[in-house]
From Swiss-Prot:
Role played: Heterochronic protein which controls the choice of stage specific cell fates. Involved in the temporal progression of vulval fate patterning, possibly by inhibiting lin-12. Acts as a transcription factor involved in the stage-specific repression of insulin/insulin-like growth factor gene ins-33.
One cellular-component annotation, GO: nucleus
Record region (Disordered): 165-228, 268-291
Transmembrane annotation, as ranges: none
Modifications made to the protein after synthesis: Cleaved by caspase ced-3 in vitro.
Keyword line: Developmental protein, DNA-binding, Nucleus, Transcription, Transcription regulation
Localisation: Nucleus
Name of the protein in question: Protein lin-14
Superkingdom field: Eukaryota
Amino acid sequence: MGKGQPIEPNIEQSLVDLCKRTVAMNLLHCYPTTTEHELSCEEWGNGTERSQSMAACQGCVELRKEVHDLRTAVNLILPMLPLYPQLPNTFTTAANIAAQPALHQVLQQSLLRRKPTAHTPTVPQPECPGQLRTVLSSPGSALPNVMLMNHLMINGLKPVSPTLPNGHIQPAVGEASMQTDEQQVKWSSPSSVDSNGQKTDSSAASAGDNQNIDVIGDGSESPTSSNHSVQELAMLTSHQNLFNAFKDSQFIFNQVPKQEPVAPLRVAPATNGTTNGATKAAGPERKPRKPVNDDIVKIVRNQDLSEENIATFQIPVPKAHLSDPTFRPVSEQQIIQQIIQGKKYDEMEVGETMIQLCKKLAEKRVFGPRLMSQTTVAGLNHSNYSNLPIKGICYIQHVCRKVLYDKFENEEDFWDKFREAMRKLAARCRRVRHAKKTKHNREEAQAEMLSKRYGEDIPFNLNGSGLIIPKSEPSETPAVNGDINMITMGQIGTLLTQFNADRKTPLTEVLPAELLTTFLSYLNRPKQEVQSPPPAQNPQNPN
C-alpha cells in the first residue's frame, strides 16, 4: 500500500465495538447523539494516520451511513425481539443460565460477516441487516424468551411469518422439541422465498456475483421456509401440550368451579293474526270456571206452596229460638203495615217493595238476626254457610204473593223479582254477620279492659253521679232468705247498710232514726211471737 493512499481501517473490529456499545445503550434505554468525532477517520483507522481529512476518506462516509442505518435498525428491532431463545422445559435454573454464552461472545461470532456492498436488481436488499440476523436467531443466546415461557399467552402469539397462515400443526410427541433445540435458526429475506417455500431465481445469482450474495440466508431451513415454520409451530405445540397436561392433572386449575349447563329457553308459541300483536303468557291455558248457580227459586218452586201447607209451618222457625232464645217476633200484619204505610211506598217500584218486605219478614218475624248471621240464601254448593230453613222462605214467598201479586204482569215476572229479592236477602245476611262480629269483638275488648282495671261487674258498679265505686268485698253473712218471716235482725241490718251505700242520699237524712227503730221492732215482733210459744194454761178444777 502506497504512502499517499489512506490506510484501510479495521472496519470489522470497529463495527463489532460499535454494535456492542449500541446494544448496551439500547438495553439501558440510552440513545446518545452520534457526533462527528465518533465517526471520524481516527475512530476507524489504526491511529497512525491522523492527517487525513473527512472529505478525502470516501470509505468513512459510506461506513458512517451504514452505521447510521445499522443503529436505526437495532433501535427498531432489538426492543421487540429477544436476543436469547427460551430455556429448555420452561424452567429457568442457575445451571442453565451459567451454561449460556456471554453477550459479547455472541456479538463477536455473529458480526464477523461482511455485508454486501452493492445491491443489484437481482439481489434485493434484505429486510433485516445481515449483522443482526444470526444474533436475533442464535440458539446460543442466553436471554429467556418471556413470551414463550408464559404458557398462558400461547394462543395470543402472532404467526411466525406473514406469508404463512396462523394455525397449529400437531407433530409427533417428543420429536418437535428435540429438533427445535438442536436446529440452528437462520434468517433469510422473504423476497427470496416464494409462497411454497422454494428458492426463486432472484436468490441464485451468477458466479461472478457470488461475493454479493447473502450467505446467511442460504439453505432450505431459513426462518421463513416451510420446514422452519413447521418447527416453530411444533415448539409452540409442545408448550400447549404441557399446558394441557397441567390442566388435565388439575395442577393449577383445581379451584375453577365447573359450570352447570344452562337450561334451554322455552320458545313462546307463535300467535295468530287475530291477537293484534299481543302475546299470551306461557303455560297451560286455564278454562274459565263456570259460576255456581245461586238461584234458590228452583228449590222453592219444587216445594208445596199451597195455602193449606204453608198454614202448617211454624213461624218463626224453630232454629230462630235455638240460635237466640231472646228473639221476639213481630206480627205479620204489623210488618205489612210498615211497608204499605211508608212514605216511599207509592214512589218505589214493585221489585224494590218486594225486597224491603222480604228483608223485614226475615229479620223481624221468620228467622231473626242471630240465625241470619249464621246462614245465607243461595243455591246448593254456592257458599260455605248453610241455607236458611226452606219453610221460612216459602212462607216469605206466600206473604209477598198475597200482598204484591196484583202489581205483576204474569207469573214469571213475579218469580224474577222474587229471585232478585232473595239475592238481596243473602247480602243482608252477610251484612248482619259482619255487624255481629264487629260488635261482638268491640264489646268483648271493652269488657275485658274494664274487668282488668276495676273488676268483673264494673259496668253495673256506677253510682248516680257517674263515679266509679270501688268493688265491695263480699259479706260473711249468709244469703238472705226469700221468706220475710225467716229473716233475722243481722240480715236486715246488712240489707239496710247496702241500700244506704247504693243510695245517692243517705237514708238517715230522709227518715228519722226513731222511725227506723220502730219499724225494725215491728218487723221483729211477729217473728218473736212465732218462735216463742204461748204459756200453758192450767185447767180449772170443777171443784
